[in-house]
Amino acid sequence: MTMNEQNVLNYIEYNKEEFIKISHQIHDRPELGNEEYFASSLLIKTLYNEGFTIERDIAGHETGFIATFESEHDGPTIAFLAEYDALPGLGHACGHNIIGTASVLAGVSIKEYVEAHGGTIKVYGTPAEEGGVNGSAKASYVKAGLFSDCDVALMIHPGHESYRTVPTLAVDVFEVEFFGKTAHASENAHNGINALDAMISFFNGIAQLRQHIRKSDKVHGVILDGGKSANIIPDYTKARFYTRAMSRKELDVLTGKVERVAEGAALTAGAEYKLNHIQNGVNEFIRNDLLDDLFERHARKHNETILHDDFGFGSTDTGNVSHVIPTIHPHIKIGPSSLVGHTVEFKDAAGSAHGDHALIQGAKIMATMALELIDNPDELKAIKNLHTVLKGKVYDHQ
């Protein structure tokens, strides 16, 4: 271990209780996507007090921020991705209190080194990773070109085991609405246009579609509004749907098929329909083995047992970042192997001593990774060259 690494690790150890407190404060005050006013303000205050320049209200996300610390000397730009939104009804059952705090701690811990040796640190506060209306802020940031001056992006995610970056699926989230004509269901049903019939036809059509799509494709949804009274022909219904696929290219095809099912269902019932995307489209993750190798080496230095897994069925807007710069999204263990995300048990683990340990471990790993990338321009160049190759490939999963 180099003297520079030891200095950074000493900083993290000395200040860890302060950052554990921040994580607990965010955990105890969960906020939904694009409503994370407390969490974002707390992280911004911490970064500002450490001498970072703060930009707020990023790319249409009021609770987004970019915190920058720039050396007078040339060097690479290292991005740390901070998440801090919670889940409806469950709170921090995905551990974003750990993610956001670990990224901030990693960023501030290398500030003195960057100031002396060159480079730029950027901590991106990224709201609404869990989605929802105007969700997946990282996709907005990518569209706005906000990562164009970055060399790599680093983050860690709590999990039931410690993993390298796993595959993720591209996802679209949209609402389907049907518009009919109200009528009394007994006296003059013949004058009505039943929007619920259209919705039921739509769901039946999706069930039939599933036998003609790839095994890796996913279509799932719920009815949000099915009408108000059983003796009135519903003139309006609404459902929310997710479509997922192994790549953006495949997902565009799948979502197009779902829209044609909606069109057919409307035609069958004599209704009109609308399909509205309510959040940013999320892309699959482009995994960079060289960057993950670097993560694994540094994780093992800190006594983490790292597993490899090629079966991932979730989605994250960090995938969008991976389409523009080399990015990692590894997991750090916070509880037993039986732990499952988006559960009360995971929420409890995210606020436990195990979660605190993962926060500090994640910050140490990301910080020492960043030092190696700054110190070794040839290694960074190889990682970026591999990303260019991977980005140019067309994935065709059968």
Residue ranges and their predicted role:
Residues 2, 6-9, 13-20, 33, ...:
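Electropositive phosphate-/nucleotide-binding environments in soluble metabolic enzymes
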Residues 2-122:
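Acidic/His- and Gly-rich active-site-bordering loop/insert found
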Residues 26, 67, 80, 96, ...:
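Divalent metal-coordination and catalytic microenvironments
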Residues 27-29, 85, 92, 96, ...:
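Histidine-centered active-site/metal-ligand motif
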Residues 28-29, 122, 129-131, 180-188, ...:
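Active-site-proximal beta-alpha loop/turn segments in soluble metabolic enzymes
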Residues 63, 68, 85-93, 97-98, ...:
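Histidine/acidic-residue-rich, glycine-tolerant segments that coordinate divalent metal ions
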Residues 79-81, 174-175, 179, 329-335:
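Non-cysteine beta-strand/loop elements that form the S-adenosyl-L-methionine
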Residues 200-398:
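Metal-dependent amide/peptide-bond hydrolase catalytic core
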